[in-house]
Structures are given as structure tokens and as C-alpha cells.
Amino acid sequence: MTDPIADYLTRLRNAIMAGHRVVSVPASNIKKEITKILFDKGYILNYKFEENDSQGIIKVALKYDLAHKVNAIKKLKRVSRPGLRKYVGYRDMPRVLNGLGIAIVSTPRGVMTDKEARELKVGGEVLCYVY
């Protein structure tokens, strides 16, 4: 697989469209960090890391509003990809939906949201947009 982050986002997107409550994805350090950000910002209900004999599995519980039949994540968009990396400085950090969404950025200080990167004045690679 050439782009594990795109695979992770696609698995989440497919589970949302199918109406699944829980989705299992192969674990990696960057996927764990992205999942933690999604949980902290309220886009997913819960997550659990399960150790197995190889790399482990992340089980993500998706968040839905059952009364209106909508989910918390409207769109997951991969920005920087292996064929075309997108790096930005903290001054040029993108604002997703004028601040209503988040951009997940990989910086020298770790994976964080666009707002945190602006506050710490650190740039990096824009991994994806979530709104």
C-alpha cells in the first residue's frame, strides 16, 4: 500500500456511508495520532487500540445523530499525498470552512490541528481536512 493515511480515511468514509457503528483499521503511529485528534475534537465517539501479533488494530466508534440521521463527519479529504506533498508555514496554514472544520498537520512537534500549529508558530505537512 502506497498511502496508508488515504486508506485509513477511505475506510472511515466507507463505514460512514454504510452506516456502520464501528470500523477496524490496521494501526500505525500516525493513524493513532489522527484518531486521537478526531476524538479530542468530537468527530468520533470513541476509539480503542487492540494489540495483536503484528501491528495492532484501531477500533473506531463513529458518532451519529440518530434523530436527524447524520454523522459528525461530513467530509474527510486527503490533501498531501505521496505523489504531491503539501507543506505550509504557520502563516499560510489553511482555514477549513472558515474555522468550522479542522486541518490535520504533521509538524516537527508531532501531529496536530491547524489551530494548534498556528498558536505554536510551526508549519508542516497538511495531511487532511475534516469537517
UniProtKB/Swiss-Prot annotation:
Which Pfam families does its entry note?
A: Ribosomal_S8
Recorded hits in SUPFAM superfamilies, A to Z, give: Ribosomal protein S8
An example Gene Ontology molecular-function term: rRNA binding
GO biological process per UniProt: translation
Keyword terms, alphabetized: Ribonucleoprotein, Ribosomal protein, RNA-binding, rRNA-binding
Q: Which cellular components does GO assign to this protein?
A: ribonucleoprotein complex; ribosome
* HAMAP family for this protein: Ribosomal_uS8_B
Per UniProt, subunit arrangement is: Part of the 30S ribosomal subunit. Contacts proteins S5 and S12.
Family under the similarity heading:
Belongs to the universal ribosomal protein uS8 family.
| Task performed by this protein | One of the primary rRNA binding proteins, it binds directly to 16S rRNA central domain where it helps coordinate assembly of the platform of the 30S subunit.
Q: What protein name applies here? A: Small ribosomal subunit protein uS8
The encoding gene = rpsH
